[in-house]
């Protein structure tokens, strides 16, 4: 069982602490800011531009990272065990990663319990939402330059649980992270707008309502603009439950409007 874990992935950091492996963690990267206990182990280590010497200085017996760089090969050459948790595409990917981390850290039972609790909470959130005759259409905003996501992403999976339609799916393109035009978004007049750029960029219901032409969209005119914590929306860890519950609340709000 590893006793000196270094985490270079904010998502993996959240998973490690949620399965009770936090005491085995000696260092986390500069983006790992949750839970509070992880902040006590914050360092200048970077998951984006990892420095293998700086990592090795913590004498880790397990390094967890997202596999987005060639760090794995470098750690292998130094004989340092490492675990890769690549960006999840589905809920099953998330559950599998939590279970794998549980096995890798000696917390199999805690990991299984966490997965069971997550499944139950997500099921409950989805079941709590009244079925609407017409599936609402949404726009998910990654940043103020109108980058969005298609349904082909993990974020899209979250909205897909509720049968929501994504306006970005109609864009022709090869990327799952398309940049939409303001004209396109306004012309689509989405029923719901989800802002994942409040922490980074200060976007809010008010700032969106003040954009020229946006006040006429269905979402803005009905007050159906919702803020999602940037971190929660960009990580595929235990707090995805919070994300699902927020979307459930948004759906309940829209259902009330259509019933009203």
Task: List PLM regions with ranges.
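Extracytoplasmic substrate-binding proteins
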Residues: 4, 71-147, 168-170, 188, ...
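A short, structured surface patch at a secondary-structure boundary
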Residues: 4-68, 80, 164-167
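His/Asp/Glu-enriched short active-site or ligand-binding loop at hydrolase and phosphoryl-transfer sites
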Residues: 152-177, 227
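Short, solvent-exposed loop/turn elements at domain surfaces
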Residues: 13-18, 33-38, 146-150, 194-195, ...
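A ligand-binding cleft/hinge motif common to bilobed small-molecule-binding domains
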Residues: 70-77, 191-211, 215
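Short helices/loops that flank or line small-molecule/ion binding pockets
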Residues: 52-60, 77-78, 179-189
